[in-house]
Amino acid sequence: MDPDRQKLIERARELNTSEFPVIELQERIREVCFEYLIEAKVDVDHLLGHEDWRVRSSALDMVWWGVGATDGIAASIEILMHDPDEDIRAEAALALYEAARGTPKETQVREAFRRVSAAAEAPEYLRAAALTYLGKLDHPSGQRRVGPGVGPVSE
């Protein structure tokens, strides 16, 4: 293996065992995604549970790219449903859509999107995002969409 890549993998693995300032965590997470360091086996679930929203946001990129030892789907669903930061919840919706389509986890993600789209306490834009991604999962060709409160409708 290329020594430079090995060094990047070791830096990424430190995300599992060391505490770093938020900026350092974000930089290392970006490296994992940019270099597609799947060999590093980063514990995405641990990063998704971080107290700082910036780390959770960066970790959602790992879910999207599928580069962690843990896939982060369950933790991302938890963020989608309950994170105190509404913007992070919206990011989780996109990451879940990208990570789950065509995988065995798609059923879990569909159910989470259904729950969010029907949750009166969820912000309108989050309900709309959940409906949109649910529609995209249902009709990946883009020929049909899900309309608010009406179910699948033709374009």
Predicted regions mapped to residue ranges:
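N-terminal "cap/leader" segments of large eukaryotic alpha-helical scaffolds
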Residues: M1-I29
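Amphipathic alpha-helical scaffolding segments comprising HEAT/armadillo-like alpha-solenoid repeats
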Residues: D2-R13, E35-G49, G68-H82, T103-S117, ...
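Secondary-structure boundary/capping motif
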Residues: I9-R13, R56-S57, A75-S76, R89-E91, ...
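Short coil turns that connect the paired helices of HEAT/ARM alpha-solenoid repeats
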Residues: E14-F20, L48-R54, M81-D87, A118-Y125, ...
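Structural detector for internal amphipathic alpha-helices that build alpha-solenoid repeat scaffolds
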Residues: E19-Y36, H46, S57-A69, D87-P104, ...
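A sequence-level detector of short, solvent-exposed, charge-rich linear segments
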Residues: V63, E78-I79, L96, E111, ...
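Acidic, small-residue rich beta-repeat scaffolds with periodic aromatic anchors
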Residues: P123, T132-L134, S141-E155
